A protein has these predicted regions:
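N-terminal glycine-rich anion-binding loops that anchor highly charged ligand groups
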Residues: 6-38, 58
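Mobile, glycine- and charge-enriched loop segments
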Residues: 1-5
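Thiamine diphosphate
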Residues: 30-101
Length: 101
C-alpha cells in the first residue's frame, strides 16, 4: 500500500470511500465543505449539494434505510435545521451505516 499525504477533510472523504460509501448529501459550509468536494471525485459515489440541512439529512437517512451507506455533511448549527429527520431516524432505525459530520 502506498502512502499519500492528505489534509484532514481529504482523509475523512477517503475513509468514507474505503468504508463503502455510496451516497453523500451535504449542505455547504466551513469546515465540512471539503469533505463532499473530495467525495464528488469518486465516480461510484452519488454526491449532491442539498438546498438545506434538512434535505441533506433526509437523503442520507433514506439512502441508509434503503441499504446504501451514506454521509450527511453540514455546519454544527445546521443540525438544528436537520433535527426532525435526525430524531425520526433515531427511532425508526437505518439498514446501513450513516455518518453525520
Amino acid at each position: 500500500m502506498s502512502k499519500k499525504l492528505l489534509i484532514g477533510n481529504e482523509a475523512v472523504a477517503r475513509g468514507l470511500y474505503e468504508g463503502g460509501l455510496r451516497v453523500a448529501s451535504s449542505y455547504p459550509g466551513t469546515p465540512s465543505t471539503e469533505i463532499t468536494e473530495c467525495i464528488a471525485k469518486y465516480d461510484d459515489v452519488y454526491s449532491e449539494w442539498a438546498p438545506n440541512e434538512k434535505v441533506a439529512m433526509e437523503v442520507a437517512v433514506g439512502s441508509s434505510i434503503a441499504g446504501a451507506r451514506s454521509f450527511c455533511g453540514m455546519k454544527h448549527v445546521g443540525l438544528n435545521v436537520a433535527a426532525d429527520p435526525l430524531f425520526t431516524a433515531s427511532y425508526t432505525g437505518v439498514n446501513a451505516g450513516m455518518v453525520i459530520a
